[in-house]
Amino acid sequence: MKRLRAQVASFDRPARLLMVNQFAINCGFYMLMPYLADHLAHGLGLAAWAVGLVLGVRNLSQQGMFLVGGTLADRYGCKPMILAGCALRTVAFGLLAAAASLPVLILASALTGLAGALFNPAVRAYLAAEAGEERRVEAFATFNVFYQAGILIGPLAGLALLALDFTVVCTVAALIFGTLAVLQARALPVRPPADRGAEPIWRAVAADWRTIATNRPFVLFAAAMSGSYVLAFQVYLALPLQARELFGDRTGLVTGAIFSVSALAALSGQLKLTAWAKENLPGPRAIVYGLTAMGAAFVPLLPGSHGAVVGVGALTLCAALLAWGGALLYPFEMDTVVRLSGDRLVATYYGAYNTASGIAISLGNLAVGALFDTGVHWLPWAVLATTGFLCAGMVTRLNRAGYLTPRPTVVAVQG
């Protein structure tokens, strides 16, 4: 804790505000979302297809709009997009508190996703610009501590509020985002966007997107890293499925413990891992080590049968290694995206990167589900482990080929 306080204090006020902002964003989001499906199915009595539709709309609207959100941040400034995202979440969660019909639920879900697409790229671009090249890695490491703390505390707060009513959960979450919007409107300094000239907006945006699509190092890096997001998501898919197979009706307790282990491992290891890696490893090598650890996380689950004790140990070790691997690579990954952008259109690059990751998660989860349906116990874990090792190999090749060498700065980030 002392190390964290010192690290936070070393940054300027805007960076500190963004870190606290991300903690509150995740608290508000995760106090509600883990319990939404149960509320829709049992509280409102929706059919399973309708529950899937509502949740799917949220994911589609967020992943599909990340690129647009990043583009808007680069064109109009990061602060307006952060404020707009928080305001939209306030409205969306307020609608969820009152909604009883499917059309209103779909609208609320779409607004929830759109809000994330607006503020996520903007927050990261603002933080990258505020920290500067020398301190970007440390800034994103500290940012991730707050990010993970929100993931840990949010569901616990939601569970406590759920004892009252799901409407209370939605209302509190909406109030959190409303408060964030007001506080940041008053306290977050404006960073004017770069001068975009007199070119028509549609033509300028098309040129920006074309620049990103033809940035071969960035496209290859995004493709290589997409597997890491599929692996990280398995805390919510493959590990609970395995827990269900091992523990039946006690799955909820085991899954909750897995989530806690994952968040606590990231919280406890983030700053130490980053400090060690920055002192001993170049950025690309740190990413490779992180990907390797994430692939290795699934190896303990390969044996064909587990008793209860061994099963819990394997699941816990998998969750911890996934968290540590992700913590090791994350700050260097975020820094690499900025470097590959040439410090230009940073929010748009983050938006494109998030969109690619979201597509990978959707396709990867379909594949993982299909692998479980084969009934071959070891197959999902073997494929997941291999994915991590292949991604590590791809990043190694990109680095050796010189693709991850920083590009020269073209225009300083202003948005």
Labelled PLM ranges:
Residues 80-94, 285-300:
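Structural signature of the two symmetry-related core transmembrane helices
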Residues 65-77, 268-283, 372:
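Helix-to-loop junctions at the C-terminal end of transmembrane segments
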Residues 63-100:
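Conserved MFS/SLC helix-loop-helix module at the cytosolic interface between two early adjacent transmembrane helices
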Residues 1-12, 189-221, 415:
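Juxtamembrane intracellular "pre-TM" segments in multi-pass secondary transporters
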Residues 34-49, 237-254:
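Short amphipathic helix-loop junctions that connect adjacent transmembrane helices
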